[in-house]
Amino acid sequence: MIRLEPVTDTPPAGFDAIRRDARAERYNMLDRLASEWESGEQRFTRPGEALLAAYSENALAGIGGVTVEPAFAGAFRMRRFYVRPPYRRLGIARRLALALLEGLPSANRLVTVNASANRHRAPIGTGAARRSTEREP
């Protein structure tokens, strides 16, 4: 069973292990998360922002967040998503993403992602992303 918990005060239990896994796959997003958290630059505290940890049993299986997108007024950005290899293909990223989307203010649900994340978007029903320089017609 997968349990989602908000991350508010400190990095979640098991963060060092998930960070090592990400680094071993040459992903640096969790190093950036740790650095930004420690400096206070990003704590996911603005209205609509959230960082969620996904646990399988008591093991940290995944993490993901949503922040205010400064490039577009009223928009948000999915970021710092990672699911540990043994827990992939179990719907954890989908659960994280949907929970984060449900927590956004209903007035505006424009969400941006890094273009390299497009292959992960279809399973949650959001389709391919446009480049950040493209605008809706």
Locations of regions flagged by a protein language model:
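Conserved N-terminal entry element of GNAT/NAT acetyltransferase domains
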Residues: 1-17
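Hydrophobic alpha-helical core bundles mediating ligand binding, dimerization, or RNAP-core interactions
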Residues: 15-26
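Active-site rim helix/loop that mediates acceptor-substrate recognition in acyltransferases
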Residues: 27-53
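Short coil/loop residues immediately preceding or within conserved phosphate-binding loops
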Residues: 48-49, 73, 78
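Conserved beta-strand in the GNAT
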Residues: 53, 59-68, 77, 82
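Conserved acetyl-CoA-binding loop-helix of GNAT-fold acetyltransferases
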Residues: 83, 89-102
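Conserved beta-strand-loop-alpha-helix junction that forms the acyl-donor binding cleft
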Residues: 88, 111-125
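Conserved catalytic-core motifs of GNAT/GCN5-like acyltransferases
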Residues: 112-114, 127-137
